[in-house]
């Protein structure tokens, strides 16, 4: 079944209702995968449907994070024949999900990862990715004479920030300008088809 980029409720809810636990393969961008997982979450079948992913870009953060093949034919084979493994789903306080890379940039404010202060002041960017162990990992970047470099790393269940208005990006898509944002690990993992049969 073909759908538009970043499909929504009107395109997905009916086909997803008929899956009955069968595998679902998403071919597209990290943002497309996030849109499908959001619908699985909202229809209550997130943990019941194994999801395969064939990234349309060799630079997919999801493929890099979870060791998925970047060659489409190999990725499709794994998506169709692979075994599922639970991986964390990261949500945000605006009702979205993050499956690859979240970016806030530029940043002037305070950010916490769980109860640890990871930023107080200015940074070029703050990056968040899902993390198998705790739920998410955060990296604070500052620009110096030699370019951007990571100055702080942390992992935890949530990252919260308050700042002067800045831009938030989810999985390569500009989301909004805001002065506060939260990403957190959802209570239920999703089933990624990533282990060879």
Where are the predicted features?
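Extended, charged low-complexity segments
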Residues: 164-197
């Amino acid at each position: 079944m073909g759908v538009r980029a970043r499909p929504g409720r009107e395109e997905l809810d009916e086909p997803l209702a008929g899956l009955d636990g069968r595998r679902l393969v998403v071919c597209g961008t990290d943002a497309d995968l996030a849109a499908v997982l959001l619908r699985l979450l909202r229809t209550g079948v997130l943990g019941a449907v194994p999801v395969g992913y064939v990234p349309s870009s060799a630079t997919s953060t999801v493929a890099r994070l979870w060791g998925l093949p970047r060659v489409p034919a190999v990725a499709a084979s794994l998506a169709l024949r692979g075994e599922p493994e639970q991986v964390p789903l990261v949500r945000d306080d605006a009702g979205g999900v993050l499956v690859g890379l979240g970016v806030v940039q530029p940043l002037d404010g305070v950010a916490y990862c769980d109860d640890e202060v990871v930023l107080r002041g200015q940074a070029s960017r703050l990056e968040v990715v899902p993390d198998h162990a705790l739920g998410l990992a955060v990296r604070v970047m500052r620009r110096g004479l030699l370019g951007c470099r990571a100055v702080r790393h942390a992992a935890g269940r949530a990252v919260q920030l308050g700042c002067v208005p800045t831009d938030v990006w989810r999985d390569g898509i500009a989301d909004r300008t805001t002065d506060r944002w939260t990403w957190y690990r959802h209570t239920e993992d999703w089933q990624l088809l990533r282990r060879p049969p």
